């Protein structure tokens, strides 16, 4: 029982860590291009996007964990690692596509099917997996960090979306309006997080 509670505690502690102190967007710049695309896109629900991203991260984590252990004994693990992890992401994406295709006639099924490529084929997914393996996370740490990274991405989307509404002031020079001021805002938020965690990442 103690082992189970300890594993659950590790899972949630790494999830919280990934949401705030090690936010994929603000500390490593993962998925920024996709985030900028989401802001202002009323066709794509940020909530459904984050849900698919979280599911993808959690499903990829165990696959990448065991695949990483398998290739560790190979002659060139560093060269194989990105290819193997891309294959893990592809397998999970195919599984999600099959499930959503079967449910496409149900409520939100078609919308989720359209969002799936945006959420699954994302540098945030592959980058998070590479961080997990580079830091030699355990299985529960990897899954918790994956879930937290997805939730942290949602937090970043919400913050940038709110900023997009507020940064339409006439006081902002025309040359900075739109994407430039959005990137400046993301940079300021990243610096604020560095103020809590220090310049180097804490993992």
Q: Residue locations for each model-derived region?
A:
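Generic transmembrane alpha-helix signature in multi-pass membrane proteins
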Residues: 29-35, 99-103, 115-118, 123-137
């Amino acid at each position: 029982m103690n082992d189970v509670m300890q594993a659950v505690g590790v899972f949630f502690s790494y999830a919280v860590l990934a949401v705030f102190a090690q936010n994929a967007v603000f500390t490593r710049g993962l998925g920024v291009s996709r985030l900028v695309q989401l802001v202002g896109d009323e066709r794509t629900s940020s909530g459904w996007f984050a849900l698919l991203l979280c599911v993808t991260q959690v499903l990829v984590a165990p696959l990448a964990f065991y695949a990483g252990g398998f290739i560790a004994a190979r002659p060139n693990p560093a060269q194989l690692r990105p290819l193997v992890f891309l294959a893990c992401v592809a397998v999970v994406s195919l599984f999600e596509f099959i499930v959503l295709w079967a449910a496409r006639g149900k409520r939100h099924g078609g919308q989720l099917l359209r969002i799936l490529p945006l959420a699954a084929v994302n540098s945030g997914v592959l980058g998070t997996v590479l961080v997990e393996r580079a830091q030699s996370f355990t299985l529960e740490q990897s899954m918790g960090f994956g879930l937290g990274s997805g939730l942290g991405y949602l937090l970043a989307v919400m913050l940038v979306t709110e900023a997009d509404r507020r940064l339409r002031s006439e006081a902002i020079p025309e040359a900075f309006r739109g994407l430039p001021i959005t990137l400046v805002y993301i940079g300021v938020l990243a610096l604020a997080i560095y103020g809590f965690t220090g310049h180097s990442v804490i993992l």
